[in-house]
Amino acid sequence: MNGLKSITVTLAVLVFGLVFLSDAGAQGEAQWEKTVAAAKKEGELSIYLNAPAQVRPALTKAFDERFGIKIYVVTGTGPELSAKIVSEYSAGLYQADVSFQGCSTLITLIGTHGYLAPIEPMLILPEVRDGKAWFGGQLNYDKAGTAFRFINHALPPVVYNTDSVKANSIQSFLDLQRPEWKKKILMHDPSILGAGANGISYLATLWGLSKAKDYLSTLLKAQEAAVTRNYQQHVEWVGQGKYAVALWPNPGQAARYVKAGAPIAVTHLKEGAVASPAFGCLGVPAKPAHPNAATVFVNWFLSREGQTLAVKAYELPSARLDVTASGVLKEFVIAPEQKVFIENEEFNAMQDKWIPEWKAVVESVQR
């Protein structure tokens, strides 16, 4: 009799659980349909975008076809777009709905002003809210929950010209101090937030700040390395043979030129790589002009459908585990045995703190 009672109670709990889940699912579906309808009434979406050129048409076309909502895009560098949002908010103008930038740029240049909204309350679709679908088994937010990391890739620190550089001739950062590389290195400017600052800051975590500064000084003074802030030029000039090596390149630009057949290759070094989102971070300003359209876009973009499109457009692997890295260069995909440093918020904070150190080294050479 007790056994029968136990079975009855268990079945009752199970049925209640199923009813609860079914009801929760129905509520979520109703909320989604209501939000989509409201978004269609708004009719448009404004995105501030720092990404490779091919991302813009891919996003606008797919979202318009899927929901009938037009996307208007403002492009620029991370610092430019951040300054624009801060300036607009300071003037009481709320024009941006979504911003795509690097995580450190979003957090440091916009989030610290309180101009980013928490993302989790916007997430409606179960497949997006499910932490198990994402790298690390959890939703990839910063601590404030306002910057969502949707790209996760191994960041190759070197691009080289295959006509003038033999494969495996550069295996360590220290190899670039050899005489044969004098006047042949083009690095991304480490004195601003970006790939260069990310790269030298990683070395500072490995070696300590003093040794990293000495290394940067050696490259700039003894090796007479050139500096650029133009990501396309950085890789293009190596492909054209003006320089043999691009140090700390933009991954999207590197992938584009490799796939186009330029005489370049990317390589990892023995010191390991940073597992980075690059500019693959999404934020929603605190007062979006079209809040429902922003919510629909965020859910769609972070879904399997949206991330499949993102992989094709960015040519970098998604942080979603159920999205394949088809078409992505193997050097950008984190291998199971690969030595990587997972870029995190603490690293981003140190990176920002160290910018004046790198700037001082760069300026000492330019005097």
Predicted regions and their residues:
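Extracellular/periplasmic bilobal clamshell ligand-binding domains
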Residues: 324-367
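A bilobed periplasmic-binding-protein/Venus flytrap-type ligand-binding module shared by bacterial periplasmic
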Residues: 157-164, 200-204, 277-290, 309-313
